[in-house]
């Protein structure tokens, strides 16, 4: 088996940030929408503004994200990096990872410790993400960490509300029904 095939057999693989787990198909069709395959990653934060753009509605400025509707007619030479994060855990986990993906590189690391489990992949020369070059490309790792830090600086730490056990169980049951737990 190749490295690519071997890692898919790891017990915690579903908690990774490799492209085979991140890439999902997304289809938009309708009047005035040109048929085109967009191969670069699209940020989920940009879907809502794109739908507003397609419907010719004004987009509230306080909401983050940018329309990618123009990608149907032209190429984006400078796309924003995509923030990537493993599935959030109910309790802190050593497997939690955060990172960013650009057209040329992917960088991710432990969510709590920026020096732990650091990965950097050159997606042009290694599209299957087999060779982690983080130990050889310190400057690039620092650049990617700076980008990641600027993205995560906008997030806030939300304190868990104090809810009783009965309410917490109801929430758990609903999440189970929806397939999240």
Q: Could you tell me what each predicted segment is?
A:
Residues 1-181:
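Catalytic domains that recognize anionic headgroups
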